[in-house]
Amino acid sequence: MKDIFNFFEKPKDPLSFSAIRISLASPDKIRQWSHGEVKKPETINYRTFKPERDGLFCAKIFGPVKDYECNCGKYKRMKHRGVVCEKCGVEVIQSKVRRERLGHITLATPVAHIWFLKSLPSRIGNLLDITLKDLEKVLYCESYIVIDPKETTLQRGELLSEDRYHKSMEEFGEEAFLAGMGGEAVLELLKVVGPADKGHGEGVHGLADELRAQMKEATSDAKRKKIAKRLKVVEAFVQSGNKPDWMMLEVIPVIPPDLRPLVPLDGGRFATSDLNDLYRRVINRNNRLKRLQELNAPDIIIRNEKRMLQEAVDALFDNGRRGKTITGPNKRPLKSLSDMLKGKQGRFRQNLLGKRVDYSGRSVIVVGPELKLHQCGLPKIMALELFKPFIYNKLEEKGYVTTIKSAKKMVEKERPEVWDILDEVIREHPVLLNRAPTLHRLGIQAFEPVLIEGKAIQLHPLVCTAFNADFDGDQMAVHVPLSIEAQMEARVLMMSTNNILSPAHGKPIIVPSQDIVLGIYYMTRERAFARGEGKVFASEEEVRAAYDQGEVDLQAKIWVRLDGKRVETTVGRVLLYDIVPKRLPFESINKVMDKKQLQNLIDLTYRLCGEKETVLLADRVRSMGYGNATRAGISIALENMIIPRKKQELLERAMGEVDDIQTQYTEGLITIGERYNKVIDIWAQVTEEVAQEMMSQIGQETAIGTGKDGKREERKQPSFNPIYIMADSGARGSAQQIRQLAGMRGLMAKPSGEIIETPITANFREGLNVLQYFISTHGARKGLADTALKTANSGYLTRRLVDVAQDAIITEYDCGAMDGITLGALVEGGEIIEPMGERILGRVALDDIHDPFASSVLVKANEEIDESKVKLIENAGIDKVKIRSVLTCQARRGICVECYGRDLARGRKVNIGEAVGVIAAQSIGEPGTQLTMRTFHIGGAASRRAEQSTIENRNPGLVKFHNVAVAKKKDGTLIVMNRNGEIIVTDDQGRERERYGVVYGAKLLVRDGQKIETSTLLAEWDPYSMPIITEVAGHVKYGDLVDGVTISEQVDEITGLARKAVIASKDPDARPRISIKDDQGKTRKLANSEADARYMLPEGANLVVNDGDEVDAGDVIAKMPRETTKTKDITGGLPRVAELFEARKPKEHAVISEIDGVVAFGKDTKGKRKVVITPEVDGKLRPDLAKEYLIGKGKHISVHTGDRVRAGEALMDGAANPHDILRVLGEKELARWLVDEVQEVYRLQGVKINDKHIETIVRQMLRRVRIVDVGDTNFLADEQVEKFVFEEENDKVITAGGRPAQGEPLLLGITKASLSTESFISASSFQETTKVLTEAAISGKVDHLRGLKENVIMGRLIPAGTGLPHYKHLDIEVETPVDAVEEAEEALAVASGEE
């Protein structure tokens, strides 16, 4: 391995090394690097501006200030190269050596390196087994430490205070033991590190063996953990070959002076790098200490000086880590060496991961409506500047000029020849356009430049979606790919015409929007009584001719013969059909084409006709859309906002309902929370109704005209109201915005997120009054403030995602995985949210997929499921399919093609070398930012649907109850008595069509096996409270329900009525409950078990029955109010996604059962309730295998005695904890849960992301295992290791006949996962730079440069795509037979002849 400082003889080729190692530098090493010792704190002479000799800028040590010129001026110029001047001692050489030569400072006393002292856990402390506090006492000269106790009773490493030290001296004598203080003492101790009993000599190896022995004997868990921590540090030293005493500094390197420059400003002052100040402090204190030691100064003065030296060195390495931050003259903290690396402005992120580049320019963008999709308009003056070298080259080649200088002059004069040459140079030379922020890879695309006058870049309107660009002043940057390879990649991979599909969801991203949509929508609508209605044409040409003659209107309904069939259509649609590829059926456009339909059209074209046709279609649609939008002449007038006639009536009805609820509340029938929720629901519903009224009124109009028989007639038709057209076509605006313009604004949210219960009944056309205006301002302000904050949050989320996934690259074709995941349709609340077809499209089947009704194989194992296969599977009625997934991929590094499946942006299987991790991160992060920016468009209007409180079916069929326990009331009503019951609706063949979960306490309105029609009400429940229901009839008996102790009569301020609510009691043994007694006063037993009918009441429950009341089975005895609803908005969404990916434990997480079994309640302990789950084995209960869970008093336990629960089921209300899911249900279930949870957040916003992206990130979070049992391996207990390292080590041990280690899967949050990657370069450039580097240096880590980030930092090509290592060594052999050349020449001649 080469030493990095021979790096200063720069390797010409950054590929000449394959790995980088970081380790501690020994004092000898530092002296070896150094070119001389810096003895004086002086920098440069302020009169001559020459560096002082032996100072921080000394030319003798660091090299000459001017090229080939010594300091005193005796030797000048190249001819004396390599001479050392005898007068001033300076070597005559290039001055750039001042960027690479190091010096050193020899310290008068050793000092500790602050990284190894203070970076937790303290490495020095761990090695010596001394606490950090004690260690600091020694280092900062406050206590003595015993170095060698010899024959005395003292221990090695024992601390002695000043008094105790002198007493021991008197007691044992001067020479009897050795103790010291300050750096020397610690250095001595580190030199003799070893097992406690042996004393010296065995070093870290001995210590490691001893610790391992102790580990085996240790009994308590805490002790084991402590030993493991020490062992980890010791092992690191053993394996890296670093010596522990190197953590103390005896020599300090001085970095080259040109990296800490001193610049004279005008007015005789200097601007200097902070490092110079810090070095000066160290040198000053060091020199003073040397002088004091020579003078034999009193101990106390020397001690003080040593402490000050230690502090100065600390500040140099990491200012502010310990004690006061050293500040400069302007009270600004000085930037130490650590600060140079850390953070956004540090070396890693500022200079290595992102650099400024040449051959680039930026300008404002304007729309280029007549560009082709692969073109962009580049201002001439910009092009001239960007392509200068190419122009010079061409000018010389053509003989216009002979030297570069004359070429320069010619270009500056802008002679006509220059413009001709510029045209030639940029022909077919793609340029890259980039719009910041670049949130996904489509933020940089390649275009062919077209020269234009003016100073603004022209951008094709269809790529705006990808760039998220608009023309309100956005700017874009242009970059020129220089090398031929770069040009080729730009053309093949980055050209806008090659990026039609979005990598996030595989649907087209080059989709018409705004004006184009409006134009196409307008031309495909039909208008009643238009000119030429009902005419019949023989062909498309006839229609066009008639339209050009003005015989038919664009929107007239006509009949035309197409492909031998008579079709009813409109003129506009025939004209549109003219521009779509002929392979598409006419049906695909014979409808009103809104934005959605246009997207489908482009998608269909891409699938059927390929890329080229799609691009041509996109450009034609663009031109036609703009043309027709212009002809349509659509504009907005105030009169277009039609206020619904029934609005007033609806409002009055709602007010009446609200009054009724208020009355119920004053009479004490409902709680304040229920009242609030009901009122909010009423208003939400009315707002909806007003909006529907308005839309039906705006969206319908009556056309009057002359019918066929010449009489006047009226026809209803969709309206041509411009506002309606814009929203309906998807060009601009939404129903929600129209609702605010012409309906009513509806409910608004307070800044805290609660909904204000009086809605804004006015709309913008009527105008708002002062109060309404004021309420509106909350939402608008909150929206703007949120946007600013969330953009930052979203950017940070993306950064963490990219960091964790950057080394997920497609590395092999097939990993041979035997395992996969099962996917079905995504169902929520009985609705199919995402059909299975969409979820399995583009995945690879794990096993053969058989048709259940025929014996044929629909899809073979390891075959990609494409669009046609999805149709087959759906038609066969299969509801679950096993597919291969990234989560189960067995590839050691990276992912294999088969497990990943389709590359969404290309519509075919992914290529080897694709950086799928980064794509996944971008796909998840990009909408995050978009969503954050979308809050304020609706102006904070509260969007919440009325709470779901019923279930209706959508398909007719038979009802089946699955796992539903019911109680029958006296009147025959069925009440659901358990939690995971489901109602299934099956069709005639018995195939499941729908499945709905039913809530505990719901009223069933159908019976098992009943035949039902569509939209039958199946069940209903109270959405505002959770009931507690008795299963048996009898008398109510209160238990531990004492007024003022466990229940409080809460008198409602407004109604004056009392209601009883359970409160948290001080008495730990109180168990508030209701028992049901029979007539003899005995507690009733539950129907199917021996348990008593006792119901524990959580705090917050409202009692519905009184002591002694008679109740029937299925009656509600208490209610738990549900939380008052807050608005659902991505504000909750972004932090939610972040907390899922960070795998945080939720604050109030639900306790889940680890086994299947039957519930019972044990005795309460410590104010907590005990839930016991007893498993059944062969139909018998096995109490010896039971699991117990303690649940806090106030929590609502959601299971009841005798319930059967499944492993992984929650026993109480609360959020699920991902770590529990992993432990109980395993990796696949956890992954499924994470994917669904993340998807739900995005779905609320209408954002589509393919599952495989989230799976890729989850795979990266599950890469490690935690060692539970070490076996015969080299792992440490509780150590976290990568899965494949774990498996390899185990294979080795098993082969050798040993006992393998046991591990459990570990879920790491994305930040943790990024920091624990193999590569220390990648981790240190992410976060916690000093910590990562400290750890890496001690263990002498080697970075094999496998990920993307490490390679970017090292300035190499990334090992993905065309940079994959195995492409490096490919030689392409071209065998061209003679006749092939001749053929090609002929073809060329023919082709040019045709043109």
Curated annotation (Swiss-Prot):
Signal peptide: none annotated. It holds the Pfam family RNA_pol_Rpb1_4. The keyword Protease does not apply. GO terms for molecular function: DNA binding; DNA-directed RNA polymerase activity; magnesium ion binding; zinc ion binding. GO terms for cellular component: DNA-directed RNA polymerase complex. Binds 1 Mg(2+) ion per subunit. Its cofactor is Mg(2+); Zn(2+). SUPFAM superfamilies: beta and beta-prime subunits of DNA dependent RNA-polymerase (SSF64484). It comes from the Bacteria. GO terms for biological process: DNA-templated transcription. Its EC number is 2.7.7.6. InterPro entries: DNA-dir_RpoC_beta_prime, DNA-dir_RpoC_beta_prime_bact, RNA_pol_asu, RNA_pol_N, RNA_pol_Rpb1_1, RNA_pol_Rpb1_3, RNA_pol_Rpb1_3_sf, RNA_pol_Rpb1_4. DNA-dependent RNA polymerase catalyzes the transcription of DNA into RNA using the four ribonucleoside triphosphates as substrates. The RNAP catalytic core consists of 2 alpha, 1 beta, 1 beta' and 1 omega subunit. When a sigma factor is associated with the core the holoenzyme is formed, which can initiate transcription. This is DNA-directed RNA polymerase subunit beta'. It comes from Anaeromyxobacter sp. (strain Fw109-5). The lineage of its organism: Bacteria, Pseudomonadati, Myxococcota, Myxococcia, Myxococcales.
